[in-house]
């Protein structure tokens, strides 16, 4: 069975990877590559039957000081709209498509997304931070009022939901201003058989 792993931390001007290891309990064929987003990636094809697959990833990184609100001089200023080479756009297309919603709802959400871009002088990071701040400040965390079928527009309208709803709204707004975004689900195993280890 084939598997894809993207577990290595990114290395850039504010983070250095000292060591990164990946241990897999089942034998298979391993191919390492860098994907279009510059992620260190591993394709692992397990060719023999197995009863259990244990994945152990360990990383040690050195993080250099950079205040979270200071995007320069280390981080270059990126402007919206972002410019993509045709092959990059092709690779990112699944992460650029907005959700299937009525046109009137998409227009409202697009207007909202563009309001952040305009008020931040088209600065990429500042616009994204502003969207995040707005969701954090203006939306209430309320369990049990949304479902898997709840759309980004529904969340925008009721201003309530849970983490997944806020993430989906953020992703939708990003895509409407041509910033690739996706939702990933994962977990961290912390060991032990007692509750609330995290």
What kind of region is each of these model predictions?
Residues 7-9, 24-26, 39, 48, ...:
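Generic structural "secondary-structure junction" signal
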Residues 11-13, 28-30, 50-52, 67, ...:
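A generic structural micro-environment signature
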Residues 133, 165-198:
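Hydrophobic/aromatic-rich core segments of domains that either
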Residues 44, 95, 139-141, 166, ...:
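Aromatic side chains
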Residues 1-82:
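Intrinsically disordered, low-complexity N-terminal segments that are enriched in acidic
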Residues 76-161, 169-171, 176-177:
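Secondary-structure boundary elements
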């Amino acid at each position: 069975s084939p598997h894809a792993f993207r577990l290595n931390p990114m290395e850039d001007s504010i983070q250095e990877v000292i060591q990164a290891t990946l241990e897999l309990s089942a034998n298979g064929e391993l191919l390492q590559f860098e994907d279009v987003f510059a992620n260190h990636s591993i394709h692992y094809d397990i060719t023999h039957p197995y009863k259990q697959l244990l994945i152990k990833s360990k990383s040690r990184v050195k993080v250099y000081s950079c205040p979270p609100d200071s995007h320069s001089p280390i981080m270059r200023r990126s402007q919206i709209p972002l410019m993509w080479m045709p092959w990059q756009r092709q690779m990112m297309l699944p992460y650029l498509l907005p959700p299937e919603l009525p046109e009137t709802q998409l227009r409202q959400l697009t207007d909202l997304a563009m309001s952040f871009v305009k008020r931040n002088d088209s600065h990429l990071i500042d616009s994204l931070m502003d969207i995040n701040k707005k969701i954090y400040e203006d939306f209430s965390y309320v369990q049990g009022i949304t479902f898997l079928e709840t759309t980004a527009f529904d969340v925008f309208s009721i201003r309530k939901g849970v983490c997944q709803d806020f993430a989906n709204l953020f992703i939708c707004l990003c895509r409407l201003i041509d910033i690739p975004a996706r939702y990933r689900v994962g977990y961290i195993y912390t060991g032990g058989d007692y509750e609330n280890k995290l």
